[in-house]
């Protein structure tokens, strides 16, 4: 997948259904991306790169597309895939995963079962046992990788405003969150909107 030359919003959509693999020292975790958010850098008031601000915590966001930008929010580790050329702080937040391999270990790591295991940006990273130290690594050149060949394809994609970013003017309401329609592993899904996971893919 080209993380440098494509539009960040298109990358966020294209990532839906892509297989994520994390290889721990003793365990392999896999799953399929069902929810993403695009962050558009310098002009995006909700983005960590808004206005070109650079601090030690966001250094990875300014690296070349395909870099992993990992940051902690309210004790939860959030994983972003950096997009664009070096120096342009855009990226895609991976918000939720439909789990596949390593379920028993995920249950232990999270202390939860069912859809709660991976239906949020800090939930799936804990389920996959991903460490903060992965920040700045290059996707597919470290323990975290994606598989764009053995992937799934959503039947429908929904675009909606991003989660948890009030008071950012127009950027609060822009539809930059992308979800696999009806997939129960999407965060904040109403039960009435849920479908069986297998029915949400082509």
Swiss-Prot record:
It comes from the Bacteria. GO terms for molecular function: alkylbase DNA N-glycosylase activity; DNA binding. InterPro entries: Formyl_transferase-like_C_sf, MPG, MPG_sf. GO terms for biological process: base-excision repair. Its EC number is 3.2.2.-. The keyword DNA damage applies. Gene3D superfamilies: Methylpurine-DNA glycosylase (MPG) (3.10.300.10). Pfam families: Pur_DNA_glyco. The keyword DNA damage applies. Keywords: DNA damage, DNA repair, Hydrolase. HAMAP family: 3MGH (MF_00527). Belongs to the DNA glycosylase MPG family. NCBIfam families: 3mg. This is Putative 3-methyladenine DNA glycosylase. It comes from Staphylococcus aureus (strain NCTC 8325 / PS 47). The lineage of its organism: Bacteria, Bacillati, Bacillota, Bacilli, Bacillales.
């Amino acid at each position: 997948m080209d993380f440098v030359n494509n539009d960040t919003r298109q990358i966020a959509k294209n990532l839906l259904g892509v297989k994520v693999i994390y290889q721990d020292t003793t365990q392999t975790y896999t799953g399929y991306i069902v929810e993403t958010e695009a962050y558009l850098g310098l002009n995006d008031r909700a983005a960590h790169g808004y206005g070109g601000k650079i601090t030690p915590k966001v250094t990875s966001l300014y690296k070349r597309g395909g870099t992993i930008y990992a940051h902690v929010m309210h004790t939860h580790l959030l994983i972003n895939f950096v997009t664009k050329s070096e120096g342009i702080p855009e990226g895609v937040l991976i918000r939720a995963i439909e789990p596949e391999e390593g379920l028993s270990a995920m249950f232990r790591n999270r202390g939860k079962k069912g859809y709660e295991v991976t239906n949020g940006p800090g939930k799936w990273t804990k389920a996959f046992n991903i460490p903060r130290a992965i920040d700045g690594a290059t996707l597919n050149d470290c323990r975290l990788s994606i598989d764009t060949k053995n992937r799934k394809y959503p039947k429908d994609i929904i675009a909606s405003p991003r989660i948890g970013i009030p008071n950012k003017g127009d950027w609060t309401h822009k539809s930059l969150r992308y979800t696999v329609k009806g997939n129960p592993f999407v965060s904040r899904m109403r039960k009435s909107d849920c479908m069986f996971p297998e029915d949400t893919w082509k």
